[in-house]
Amino acid sequence: LEQKKVYTTELFKNWFEVVGTLVFLAEQKDVKESSKLKSIRKETDLMKEKYMVGNKAFRGLERLVNMYQDDAMNHFRREVSLADESDYRRVCYFFAGFPIHTIAWLMDEKVENVYQRRLRLRKFIASSAFAHKELYERLLSK
């Protein structure tokens, strides 16, 4: 329980830091709109690296998914052999319930490609005999 509290608190702290920075950039009165957009893009890219893409940040997200989604990523890693770590990262984002456009941004992919990958993964799981098949199907149906 204490571990859940620590991870959840850290997640909210990071989220509010992100929101606060974006609001600050957007509300600057004496800056041209094009400069604001460049600043916001730069800041979101930095935040992506700091909070979502780095290994430490990702391990924290995976722990949260395991805590709140019935140990889904641990089961998935044991049961399913994927090509590389980025595939597991994408699955974790799916299991966490991230919107498709957010996953595309995080993975530097086109939105259509993320939809296709999720569809192929759903078909693969549907035709499998994994012990936690129902859990995976539920998490991918969001």
Language-model features and meaning:
Residues 1-13:
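Cytosolic signal-transmission helices at domain junctions
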Residues 3-4, 32-36, 99, 131:
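Alpha-helix capping and helix-coil boundary motifs
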Residues 11-25:
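Long alpha-helical scaffolds in very large eukaryotic tether/adaptor proteins
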Residues 21-57:
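Histidine phosphotransfer helical core of two-component systems
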Residues 45-47, 51-142:
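Cytosolic nucleotide-binding catalytic cores of signal-transduction proteins
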